[in-house]
């Protein structure tokens, strides 16, 4: 049951949509010129990929909508299952408590994947520029928390920690969508409300 639920949480059209839109937004920002991508390709030794990635994510409009994407993938699935009658079918085969435990795990994984894939689409290629760069530390990090991380553990640690933060971010907002789907019967509100809450908190 859990394996099947995780498969459904990851392999669905909404996951593809969430990841695709996220990646398109991020790379659209790159093409707009936020990042000197041509210079990075022609003269990678003069550009620190990590510095450019941090700069990109600090300005990218992806974060404006990022609170909505984790829940889009699978967070509202409980509402759909309730409306379709599938939840009543499940109750006859497994306890509701156990099923909800599985649901929390599957939703958390879907949220993590929906944010990790877009992050890796940037972090992986930019990490090659970091390795080739003769610029080890950038002034962009002077007032950032990552400056201390680099000093203690090196630049790879920043990529890893940022990835973990993206995973936790995805889990948090996907679980929020699941929570909302327990009390709200309108799926469009469940999709949009996390975005509204995120904007208020942001």
Which role fits each region the language model picked out?
Residues 18-23, 187-201:
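Central hydrophobic cores of alpha-helical transmembrane segments
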Residues 93, 183-184:
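Helix-loop interface residues and adjacent transmembrane-helix termini in multi-pass membrane transporters
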Residues 1-22:
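Aromatic- and glycine-rich beta-strand/loop motifs that create alpha-glucan
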Residues 71-90:
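Transmembrane helix boundary and interhelical loop/hinge segments in multi-pass membrane proteins
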Residues 25-77, 101, 105-174, 178, ...:
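Secretory targeting signals
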Residues 90-96:
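Short helix-to-coil transition segments within interhelical loops
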Residues 16-19, 160, 164, 168, ...:
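Hydrophobic alpha-helical transmembrane segments
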């Amino acid at each position: 049951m859990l394996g099947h639920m995780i498969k459904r949480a990851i392999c669905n059209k909404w996951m593809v949509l969430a990841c695709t839109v996220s990646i398109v937004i991020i790379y659209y920002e790159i093409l707009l010129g936020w990042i000197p991508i041509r210079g990075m390709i022609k003269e990678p030794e003069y550009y620190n990929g990590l510095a450019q990635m941090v700069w990109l994510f600090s300005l990218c409009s992806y974060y404006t909508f990022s609170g909505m994407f984790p829940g889009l993938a699978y967070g509202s699935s409980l509402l759909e299952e309730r409306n379709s009658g599938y939840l009543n079918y499940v109750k006859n085969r497994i306890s509701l408590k156990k099923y909800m435990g599985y649901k929390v795990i599957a939703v958390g994984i879907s949220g993590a994947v929906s944010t990790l894939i877009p992050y890796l689409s940037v972090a992986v290629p930019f990490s090659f520029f970091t390795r080739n760069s003769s610029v080890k530390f950038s002034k962009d990090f002077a007032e950032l928390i990552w400056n201390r991380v680099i000093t203690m553990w090196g630049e790879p640690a920043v990529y890893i920690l940022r990835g973990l933060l993206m995973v936790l971010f995805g889990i948090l907002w996907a679980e929020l969508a699941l929570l909302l789907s327990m009390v709200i019967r309108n799926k469009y509100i469940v999709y949009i409300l996390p975005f509204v809450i995120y904007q208020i908190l942001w």
